A protein has these predicted regions:
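Coil residues (strongly favoring Ser/Thr
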Residues: 38-39
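C-terminal motif of bacterial Sec signal peptides marking the signal peptidase cleavage site
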Residues: 17-20
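Long, charged/polar, surface-exposed segments that mediate recognition or autoinhibition
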Residues: 92-159
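Second-shell loop/turn segments in exported
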Residues: 50-59, 127-135
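Bacterial N-terminal signal peptides that target proteins for export
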Residues: 1-10
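Bacterial signal peptide processing site
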Residues: 22-24
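Amphipathic alpha-helical segments
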Residues: 57-78, 135-155
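Short, exposed beta-strand-loop hairpins at the edges of beta-sheets
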Residues: 157-174, 179-180
Length: 181
C-alpha cells in the first residue's frame, strides 16, 4: 500500500513538472515612465526676503554681502552657534527673535519668527548660504525663483537638489530653507 502511495505521488509530481514546462510564458514590454518637467513660471521676488538672484550674487562676490543685506533690512549676529548643533560665521536675521542664550556664545535654538512681517534669516556656514523662512508662501516663492533662474531638479527627495553648471541649490521643504553651494 505504501508503495502505491509513493508511486502515485511521484507520478503526480512528474505530471506537474512536465505540465509546467510546456506552458508558454508571456513576455511584457518594459514600461517607459514619461519624464516630467518642472513648470517654470515668472515669479516676482518678495520684497521682505532676500531674492535668489541677490543670494547668488553674494555667493559669487562676498564683498557685496553687507550692501545686499542692508538693502533688505537684515540685522547681523556674528558667530551664532546653536548649542551642539550648528555654528554659523554670520547670521543675518529679519523679523526674528534670537533664541535664548545658554552660555556666553551658544544659543538654545535657531532664530524664532515674530508675528509681524515675513520672518527670515540668512546664515553663512562652510562655504554655503542658507536662507530660511517661516511661512509656506515665502518658501514657495524662493523655490519658484530657483526654477526661474534656470536651475533644474537633479535629485528629488526630502531635500530637492537643483543644479545649474557647477552651482547647486538644495531646497528643504520641511525646514523651509534653501541652501546655495
Amino acid at each position: 500500500m505504501k508503495k502505491n502511495v509513493w508511486i502515485a505521488s511521484i507520478v503526480l509530481v512528474l505530471a506537474l513538472i512536465l505540465n509546467s514546462c510546456s506552458t508558454q510564458q508571456k513576455t511584457t514590454a518594459p514600461v517607459v515612465a514619461p519624464v516630467t518637467q518642472d513648470t517654470v513660471v515668472a515669479v516676482e521676488p518678495l520684497k521682505e526676503v532676500i531674492s535668489i538672484a541677490d543670494a547668488l550674487d553674494m555667493y559669487q562676490n562676498p564683498d557685496k554681502v553687507d550692501a545686499i543685506t542692508k538693502k533688505y533690512g537684515y540685522k547681523l549676529k556674528t558667530n551664532y552657534e546653536v548649542y551642539r548643533l550648528d555654528k554659523f560665521n554670520k547670521m543675518y536675521y529679519k523679523n526674528c527673535v534670537l533664541a535664548k542664550l545658554l552660555t556666553a556664545d551658544k544659543y538654545e535654538d535657531y532664530p524664532k519668527p515674530m508675528r509681524k512681517g515675513v520672518s527670515s534669516y540668512v546664515a553663512f556656514k562652510d562655504g554655503a548660504i542658507i536662507i530660511a523662512v517661516f511661512n509656506q508662501p515665502a518658501y514657495d516663492n524662493l523655490v519658484a525663483q530657483v526654477k526661474a533662474a534656470g536651475f533644474t531638479l537633479d535629485m528629488p527627495g526630502s531635500e530637492d537638489i537643483y543644479t545649474k553648471g557647477n552651482r547647486t541649490i538644495a531646497c528643504y521643504k520641511d525646514g523651509k530653507s534653501v541652501r546655495i553651494q
